[in-house]
């Protein structure tokens, strides 16, 4: 079974975008607002947190499209995301965004109550990225770091927490990558972490956390 998981990971690694959280700000609102958008491959595990707010708002993938052709040979792939904003389980708005590597374009938010359209733009962060990332998957908030440590924290909706350590890259230039997919083929997305072998680009180490819908917990394979 582990061999099957590894083959599955290797198949999709070539086409997915290693997303990291981005900060967006409004450009045409009467009062500027800012938000941080967290998301994984294909837009999965996404949520937003508005500046000055403690609450996080889940985002449900409405559509995702990968375009590897229109840019031509040697050009970065285009990732088109559309998310539904869900507040207390109810639809509250729509986010749209185009990403090409580190370039963000056509980011918008449409508020459901009055269909107000807000244009958003990327806020350029100063200094090097801290590597911190988070997902919201099956109601659990998952926190980890791509570059600087191997700590994994999963916080469940009932307040329980799980702490773990992930394999850490041998090379200082390597990064911890993550993939959200249904590895157990049971209709529920799971979570995998992969690191390259000594930074050579061959993904030889991986850790998979399968989601159990009965216990509502993640567990390693």
Residue ranges and their predicted role:
Residues 15-19:
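Sec/Tat signal peptide C-region and signal peptidase I cleavage site
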Residues 21, 26, 30-41, 54-181, ...:
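Beta-propeller-forming repeat regions
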Residues 43-45:
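Extended interaction-bearing regions that mediate binding to partners or small molecules
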Residues 3-13:
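Sec-dependent N-terminal signal peptides
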Residues 48-51:
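N-terminal ectodomain recognition module in secreted, GPI-anchored, and membrane glycoproteins
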Residues 2-3, 159:
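Low-complexity, repetitive regions of proteins mediating host interaction that are extracellular
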Residues 13-14, 197:
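Single-residue recognition of alpha-helix boundary sites
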